[in-house]
């Protein structure tokens, strides 16, 4: 077992604080509209320029192991806030540093750390309740655009694009972010359900210019097994041909005689038909086929359920207003399924998302949810250089997360003002002794820190003066660091998602409390590796034999 170094008491806490400060000081320069960029060296490729707190935090590893532990604890604040709310990572870091700094002064002066922690916890609970109280819900496109703009570091183009995407695919819809080939940033919306399977044969193409198979007012046959024998497919094919409507066949695979017969009939013009493989694998494939069936009002022909392909009737077939198939994707628009069944399926998937413990499963469930609830929007991010592209893409992803958070829990006034207004809730926090009262006051002081830092980053205004002016005002009145004016910030579009502000405070207080109640720090002893012994002189030892 490796030997360990142990630091106790003030020595441990002082070193932890150095680590906390190093990371927090690098992160907090990015806060607010006047925040600066941080340049990060990459061993391969160009350096990365970012104004995203969590990206900076994740890059920091310190040489001293105890200092590094302090830094990593605060990095956890940023990461957790990013995971939960998608934004607010810099605010969370600034709050954690302030709570730890103020708490440490009191611990050094003789306060009991555990009582400070209790006071901090009670204070945070009341501030969060007050934040929820002053929160307001958002619904309009304009409000969504404001949240997106602020979270994308005051880029109105990104805010407008996100609002447009949410407008098109709904609040539960999937919005993905991709790199564009050119310099333009644009929004592309795939309406209806799209899955990543193309036609099984190019002979199914109906539009030779676009190389797509287009089926209008189509019928859809959904089967969960391979189809290779034409005999079992023939009865339902004849019924579909009599209806005069085009037919899409979705199955695990279609091969041999069955595929050849479909192609020949398509080329002769006796049957408008196309065939694709079923999306997904294993249990996910079964679930996705069921989704398609519910969306189109059809039935999955599955022997597990007692259905046989040769006995299939027209009642088993789904229907859609339009189906477009290219070599890679199939898109079903306006499925004719019953709305109540689709809603029930959506609620079932939402329930599975809540219970899911795997990020991968959650992502796949959310994709299925989006396909059922209105489509997929793709934000294609364009830029003139790779460095700019990466930075812009990261900002768009942040803004997207923050906007979703705003839709979930509403918004509060931005610019650090919401935390100052929420300090009103501290009047309800009950302290059992003086140290707990001190814990409450630590939070009161820490709540001012984000505003102080936003002002400090402007480099032109005195933070103490701004703070006093904002504290003496009421409601949404605050300091707009972009214009350096005092105004109604909500009207000016300076807003933060409630979930972001709440998560930042809760996570900061949690980690700062752990650091305050730390009495010892244990690290591995660094081993000095001995120099390699010198090589013997040239030639083979011992001479020749």
Swiss-Prot record:
GO cellular component: cytoplasm
GO biological process annotation, one example: protein refolding
PROSITE patterns: CHAPERONINS_CPN60
Keyword Nucleotide-binding on entry: yes
InterPro entries: Chaperonin_Cpn60_CS (IPR018370), Cpn60/GroEL (IPR001844), Cpn60/GroEL/TCP-1 (IPR002423), GroEL-like_apical_dom_sf (IPR027409), GROEL-like_equatorial_sf (IPR027413), TCP-1-like_intermed_sf (IPR027410)
Gene3D superfamilies the record matches: GroEL, GroEL-like equatorial domain, TCP-1-like chaperonin intermediate domain
Keyword line: ATP-binding, Chaperone, Cytoplasm, Isomerase, Nucleotide-binding
Catalysed conversion reaction: ATP + H2O + a folded polypeptide = ADP + phosphate + an unfolded polypeptide
MF (Gene Ontology): ATP binding; ATP-dependent protein folding chaperone; isomerase activity; unfolded protein binding
EC code(s) of this entry: 5.6.1.7
Homology family: Belongs to the chaperonin (HSP60) family.
Described purpose of this protein according to its UniProt entry: Together with its co-chaperonin GroES, plays an essential role in assisting protein folding. The GroEL-GroES system forms a nano-cage that allows encapsulation of the non-native substrate proteins and provides a physical environment optimized to promote and accelerate protein folding.
Protein name: Chaperonin GroEL
